[in-house]
Design a protein with these regions (language model features):
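Conserved helicase RecA-like core
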Residues: 1-138
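Short Lys/Arg-rich cationic patches that frequently serve as NLS/NoLS or arginine-rich RNA/DNA-binding motifs
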Residues: 16, 146-163
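Intrinsically disordered, low-complexity mixed-charge segments
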Residues: 131-153
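Conserved small/polar residues in nucleotide/adenosyl-binding loops
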Residues: 169-170
Length: 170
């Protein structure tokens, strides 16, 4: 069977957009979100487990409670708002003593949320540079909080340090 991939997105609209783009690329993809009836969700999950769909694009409805052991790649199309949702999303890979990879796309506005996830996990998550052929990307420089609920704002500017920052910042 082909490798299975789950792509998580935080909204039904994003799930539908990503699914449409992947289908236009002739990829074998299914979608899962709350607009689907329960029977439709069960059918998509059955097709995914059977290997007839090898890419599943889903909201966090799938992050908890599915039991599929051979997912090798989880892609977070965006940063989840809740740190525990992140843990559940990436927990879909590397199950049953298998290796797996989780990638997270982080845009400039989501950097603070991503930093909160790192704080929750009590570790820095490895960051790789955005490939140059994708163009210039913002530097990974999340705004910090001063402990009283107020943000410490930093001056913004163009990042001229090519290759720095978090992988796949868009």
């Amino acid at each position: 069977t082909p490798e299975r991939v789950i792509i998580f997105a935080s909204s039904k609209l994003k799930v539908k957009e990503v699914t449409k783009a992947l289908k236009m690329m002739k990829l074998n993809v299914g979608e899962m979100h709350s607009d689907l009836e329960q029977a439709q969700r069960e059918e998509v999950m059955h097709e995914f487990k059977a290997g007839r769909i090898n890419i599943l694009v889903a909201t966090d409805i799938v992050a908890r409670g599915i039991d599929i052991d051979d997912i090798r790649l989880v892609i977070n199309y965006d940063v989840p708002h809740d740190s525990e949702d992140y843990v559940h999303r990436i927990g879909r890979t590397a199950r049953a003593n298998n290796d797996g990879v989780a990638l997270t796309f982080v845009n400039e506005k989501e950097q603070s949320n991503f930093k909160q996830i790192e704080n929750f996990l009590e570790r820095d998550i490895y960051k790789i540079p955005v490939p140059e052929e994708l163009g210039e990307s913002p530097e990974y420089k999340p705004r910090s909080y001063d402990g009283r609920g107020k943000r410490n704002f930093r001056a913004k500017g163009r990042n001229t340090n090519k290759g720095s920052g978090l992988s796949l910042i868009h």
